[in-house]
Amino acid sequence: MPIGVPKVPFRSPGEEDAVWVDVNRLHRERLLFLGQEVDNEVSNQLVGLMVYLSIEDATKDLYLFINSPGGWVIPGMAIYDTMQFVSPDVHTICMGLAASMGSLILVGGEITKRLAFPHARVMIHQPASSFYEAQAGEFILEAEELLKLRETLTKVYVQRTGNPLWAVSEDMERDAFMSATEAQAHGIVDLVAVENENTNDFV
């Protein structure tokens, strides 16, 4: 086992003895990372970690670092919903790129605790279809589902940014890329990190 990956006891329901499972050192510090495309596996890992850390200590904030091109909508919504319902506040920090579902997870952080690094990029757009060669009936059903998902995502951006519905809808019509300061102006993040010239740290 690599140094810095501690184990914690975990007892499954119905089992008498606990088994020891690995917990990453960064997770013990309540630091979580979304550094890839959002899919079911990544979503389940992050959801499980947030729930576990919330049970472990409901008073300490969580910090979610995001550098993601986006991914699947439903797994992304699972992460977003979990962030809203766990007891600790979830700080979201954009480093690199938060695009598509990555930007929705970014905006889902605790209001006043959403931050972007100065050279980060953010992109929002409407959900895309996976049925490029579907039968007509399947395409219609897919289109109906896409409209529902678009409505859901739009409402989230409206609620979390404070921007009017028409403005968010207009932005989502295309791939809308933003700098860190533009994302702050749009209400997607609350703060942009600035470099401390004396220490070369970001504050």
UniProtKB/Swiss-Prot annotation:
Superkingdom, according to UniProt?
A: Eukaryota
Q: Where is the active site?
A: 100 (nucleophile), 125
Q: Where does it live in the cell?
A: Plastid, Chloroplast stroma
Which reaction is recorded as catalysed by this protein? Hydrolysis of proteins to small peptides in the presence of ATP and magnesium. alpha-casein is the usual test substrate. In the absence of ATP, only oligopeptides shorter than five residues are hydrolyzed (such as succinyl-Leu-Tyr-|-NHMec, and Leu-Tyr-Leu-|-Tyr-Trp, in which cleavage of the -Tyr-|-Leu- and -Tyr-|-Trp bonds also occurs)
The terms describing its cellular component in GO are: chloroplast stroma; endopeptidase Clp complex
InterPro entries under this entry? ClpP, ClpP/crotonase-like_dom_sf, ClpP/TepA, ClpP_His_AS, ClpP_Ser_AS
The EC number(s) attached to this protein equal 3.4.21.92
Which Gene Ontology terms describe the biological processes this protein takes part in? protein quality control for misfolded or incompletely synthesized proteins
Q: Which SUPFAM superfamilies match?
A: ClpP/crotonase
**Keyword entries, A-Z:** Chloroplast, Hydrolase, Plastid, Protease, Serine protease
Record's keyword annotation contains Transport:
no
Q: Which GO terms describe its molecular function?
A: ATP-dependent peptidase activity; ATPase binding; serine-type endopeptidase activity
Can the keyword Transmembrane helix be found in this entry's annotation? Answer: no
> What does this gene product do?
Cleaves peptides in various proteins in a process that requires ATP hydrolysis. Has a chymotrypsin-like activity. Plays a major role in the degradation of misfolded proteins.
- Family named by the database record: Belongs to the peptidase S14 family.
User: What does the subunit comment say?
Assistant: Component of the chloroplastic Clp protease core complex.
Recorded protein name is ATP-dependent Clp protease proteolytic subunit
Organism of origin: Dioscorea elephantipes
